[in-house]
Regions:
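Aromatic- and histidine-enriched alpha-helix N-cap/loop-to-helix transition segments
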Residues: 17, 57, 188-192, 249-255
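Structural recognition of the beta-strand scaffold that forms the well-ordered cores
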Residues: 24, 37-38, 44-49, 70, ...
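Extracytoplasmic/secreted envelope proteins and their assembly/folding machinery
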Residues: 19, 23-26, 63-66, 95-98, ...
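Extracellular S/T/G-rich loop segment that most often corresponds to the catalytic His/Ser-adjacent loop
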Residues: 128-202, 206
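C-terminal subdomain of the subtilisin-like protease fold in secreted/lumenal serine endopeptidases
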Residues: 70-81, 104, 137-141, 204-272
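Subtilisin-like serine protease catalytic core
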Residues: 1-58, 137-138, 148-149, 157-161, ...
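Substrate-binding/access-modulating region of protease and related hydrolase catalytic domains
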Residues: 5, 9-12, 50-136, 178-190, ...
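Active-site/binding-pocket entry motifs
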Residues: 31-32, 51-52, 83, 146-148, ...
């Protein structure tokens, strides 16, 4: 792509409120007794506006925004939710920029869609295997868990394609107009993982995005062997079934910030 401009100047989109909540989850100031505490309040948020007023963002804008973020030193990149429709030319744009992010050591975090679909059987984009010549090691797909540590019923899942679950139900965070609100959604779960990734990077800046992904996978609160109820689709109709948690995602668990820092410390000491 030869363009340098991306996105639009539309301030109030259908995703504006959610994106403010994501920023609050990641980096709201801690211990000031106002609203909520962010996970990594030393983070600097780079806001790149690609959302349209309604509907999905244009993939060209997304590719250019990733390029801008990587070129300006972003360590953690959060994308909009996965999508099923990636025309070949536009898919190659995204692949190229994700590879550049990988080379520069950035981790890219993507919320799964909430359509109760097994992503091992139906391909969603972006994903780690979308490039024919190599698997992307810095890309992480996240779905939402509830307060009891169970997967939200309508989240997508996949033993080989979904990386990790994270709290995404009834999350209190910053909102529009200097207010605070409780929200639910895959994007908030992805922001939680992004916050933990940012925390790791702040303590151990030499770790790469690929290493941080490995750390997050290894340090989960394990739910392996736990049977949970999960929404599915049968002949394109919603239904429900019982699964072992480890049959729903690669890590078999829920992100754990404390354990992630311990794992990062261990990996960092091995590098010396």
């Amino acid at each position: 792509i030869n363009d340098s401009n991306y996105g639009n100047n539309i301030l109030l989109t259908s995703d504006a409120a959610t994106n403010i909540m994501k920023a609050g989850i990641i980096a709201a100031k801690r211990d000031n007794k106002i609203g909520s505490d962010g996970i990594a309040d030393q983070a600097e948020i780079m806001t790149l506006r690609i959302c349209t007023r309604e509907g999905e963002p244009y993939l060209k804008d997304m590719a250019l925004a990733i390029h801008y973020a990587v070129s300006h030193g972003a360590d953690v990149i959060v994308l909009p939710e996965q999508n099923m429709l990636y025309p070949e030319e536009q898919k190659q744009w995204i692949i190229h920029e994700l590879k550049e992010a990988e080379k520069k050591g950035a981790i890219v975090i993507v919320p799964a869609w909430n359509t109760s679909i097994d992503m091992d059987k139906v391909e969603f984009f972006p994903n780690r295997k979308m490039s024919k010549d190599k698997e992307l090691t810095n890309l992480m797909i996240v779905a939402s868990s509830d307060k009891k540590g169970n997967p939200v019923m309508d989240t997508n899942y996949g033993a080989n394609t979904l990386d990790i679950y994270a709290p995404g139900t009834d999350i209190y965070s910053a909102y529009m107009g200097d207010t605070y609100r409780t929200g639910t959604g895959e994007g908030l779960a992805a922001a939680t993982v992004a916050g933990v990734a940012t925390l790791i990077k702040s303590y151990f800046p030499k770790l790469t995005g690929s290493q941080i992904r490995d750390i997050l996978l290894k340090s989960v609160t394990s739910r392996k062997g736990v049977e949970v109820e999960k929404g599915i689709r049968v002949d394109d109709r919603p239904s429900q079934d019982l699964f072992l948690f480890d049959d729903l995602c690669i890590s078999g668990g829920i992100v754990n910030a404390y354990q992630a820092i311990l794992e990062a410390e261990k990996m960092n000491s091995q590098k010396k």
